[in-house]
Amino acid sequence: MKKSDHGKKILDGCKVLDLTQYLAGAGVTRMMAELGADIVKVEISPIGDPGRLLPAVKDERSGFFVQHNRGKKSLCLDWNKPEALEIIKDLAKDVDIVAENFGRAEILEKRGLDYESLRKTNPDLIYLSVSVFGRDTPWNKKPGYDYI
């Protein structure tokens, strides 16, 4: 290792738009943050990531949420409002990776947040889609948020 590389992490300079919730996706993007990536997490209002409500809670903060979302910047938007979707799409133009774990592709497709839609303005985009049950299985419509 060169002296100039000392302290540098493998994902330094990598920008990630985090559209994940609960555990599986949030764990992946937390590891990216630990490896130096700049993570912007966009949560769905009014409560944000449902993981915020999981025990143990102290001083109105969930230990689960803090553990799996440390090192990230976060904002909360109403994904049913067009102006909120435009903010997310604008963020997606300037990132290297978009991460999501909704399981059901139509949730993001109907909002224009799927890979095909986002790559129109960011052709080099890497789209990380975490699906517990896979996209081509009989259970592909079932939600799943745990580690895989």
Q: Where is each model-derived feature located?
A:
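N-terminal helix-loop segment corresponding to the beta1-alpha1 unit
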Residues: 1-148
